[in-house]
């Protein structure tokens, strides 16, 4: 299955189904930064921030120009804004 076909399939899938399908795809295609970014976005949408960031970092390691770079930047800005009291007690 190609990634664009998988994206259509997971569009209506539950979080667990989508992540399982993406994980299977990533296992078979470990160099696919777009798949890692897509899985990271599903993690982010489910509130699993650390899993999302790990996927973004893995995607950037594969392809520094990956759109995961922008996703990571946005995630960092959101976390910095939302958790300022944790960093500056």
Residue map of PLM features:
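Alpha-helical linker/edge segments of TPR/alpha-solenoid repeat scaffolds
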Residues: 11, 49-51, 76-89
């Amino acid at each position: 299955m190609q990634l664009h076909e998988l994206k259509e399939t997971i569009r209506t899938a539950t979080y667990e189904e989508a992540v399982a399908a993406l994980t299977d795809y990533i296992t078979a295609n470990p160099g696919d930064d777009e798949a890692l970014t897509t899985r990271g976005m599903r993690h982010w949408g489910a509130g699993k921030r650390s899993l999302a960031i790990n996927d973004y970092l893995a995607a950037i390691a594969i392809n520094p120009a990956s759109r995961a770079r922008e996703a990571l930047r946005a995630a960092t800005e959101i976390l910095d804004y939302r958790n300022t009291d944790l960093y500056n007690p």
